[in-house]
């Protein structure tokens, strides 16, 4: 695949993730957009690693590390969201003012 096509796809995914983070009012949707951002960065790492030096696996290993961190982040984030929902009965970002109570 051509490098420019993959970079355009990654930029498109990144911009969708940024747009989703800015406009999202739901915490679960915001977590999904954050995962989309991380996956677009992983796509860039793997693409540049393969394009510049396909014998070294630095980009691939770094992508696997980011995937592991993202999985832990998603697990902790969903646990926090479920706890907030249990206490507040809402997962909307603008309704959960956690510093007041």
UniProtKB/Swiss-Prot annotation:
Its EC number is 7.1.1.-. GO terms for molecular function: oxidoreductase activity, acting on NAD(P)H, quinone or similar compound as acceptor; quinone binding. Pfam families: Oxidored_q2. Keywords: Chloroplast, Membrane, NAD, NADP, Plastid, Plastoquinone, Quinone, Thylakoid, Translocase, Transmembrane, Transmembrane helix, Transport. It is a multi-pass membrane protein. The chain crosses the membrane at residues 2-22, 30-52, 61-81. It catalyses: a plastoquinone + NADH + (n+1) H(+)(in) = a plastoquinol + NAD(+) + n H(+)(out); a plastoquinone + NADPH + (n+1) H(+)(in) = a plastoquinol + NADP(+) + n H(+)(out). InterPro entries: NADH_UbQ_OxRdtase_chain4L/K (IPR001133), NUOK/Mnh_C1-like (IPR039428). One of its GO terms (biological process) is photosynthesis, light reaction. It is found in: Plastid, Chloroplast thylakoid membrane. GO terms for cellular component: chloroplast thylakoid membrane; NADH dehydrogenase complex. NDH shuttles electrons from NAD(P)H:plastoquinone, via FMN and iron-sulfur (Fe-S) centers, to quinones in the photosynthetic chain and possibly in a chloroplast respiratory chain. The immediate electron acceptor for the enzyme in this species is believed to be plastoquinone. Couples the redox reaction to proton translocation, and thus conserves the redox energy in a proton gradient. NDH is composed of at least 16 different subunits, 5 of which are encoded in the nucleus. HAMAP family: NDH1_NuoK. Belongs to the complex I subunit 4L family. This is NAD(P)H-quinone oxidoreductase subunit 4L, chloroplastic. The gene is ndhE.
């Amino acid at each position: 695949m051509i490098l420019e096509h993959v970079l355009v796809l990654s930029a498109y995914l990144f911009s969708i993730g940024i747009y989703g983070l800015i406009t999202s009012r739901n915490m679960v949707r915001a977590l999904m957009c954050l995962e989309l951002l991380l996956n677009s960065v992983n796509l860039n790492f793997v693409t540049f690693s393969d394009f510049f030096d396909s014998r070294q696996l630095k980009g691939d290993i770094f992508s696997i590390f980011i995937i592991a961190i993202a999985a832990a982040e998603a697990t902790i984030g969903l646990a926090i969201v479920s706890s907030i929902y249990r206490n507040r009965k809402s997962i909307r970002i603008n309704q959960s003012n956690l510093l007041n109570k």
